[in-house]
């Protein structure tokens, strides 16, 4: 669900130019 990713981009937005990039990878938090 893209809506669920909306809450995950908080950590993904730390080092990425676009949250769409993490939609493909799966939010690499760490």
From Swiss-Prot:
BP term (GO), one: regulation of muscle contraction
A molecular-function term among this protein's GO annotations: calcium ion binding
Coiled-coil parts of chain: none
Cofactor, how bound (note): Binds 1 Ca(2+) ion.
Function: Snake venom phospholipase A2 (PLA2) that has myotoxic activity but no significant neurotoxicity. PLA2 catalyzes the calcium-dependent hydrolysis of the 2-acyl groups in 3-sn-phosphoglycerides.
Tissues/organs with expression: Expressed by the venom gland.
GO CC terms, sorted: extracellular region
Protein name: Phospholipase A2 acanmyotoxin-2
Catalytic activity: a 1,2-diacyl-sn-glycero-3-phosphocholine + H2O = a 1-acyl-sn-glycero-3-phosphocholine + a fatty acid + H(+)
Family that this chain belongs to: Belongs to the phospholipase A2 family. Group I subfamily.
Zinc is among the record's keywords: no
Keywords: Calcium, Disulfide bond, Hydrolase, Lipid degradation, Lipid metabolism, Metal-binding, Myotoxin, Secreted, Toxin
Post-translational modification (record): Contains seven disulfide bonds.
Organism ancestry: Eukaryota, Metazoa, Chordata, Craniata, Vertebrata
EC number: 3.1.1.4
Positions of Ca(2+) binding: 28, 30
Subcellular location: Secreted
Cofactor names: Ca(2+)
Keyword Glycoprotein: no
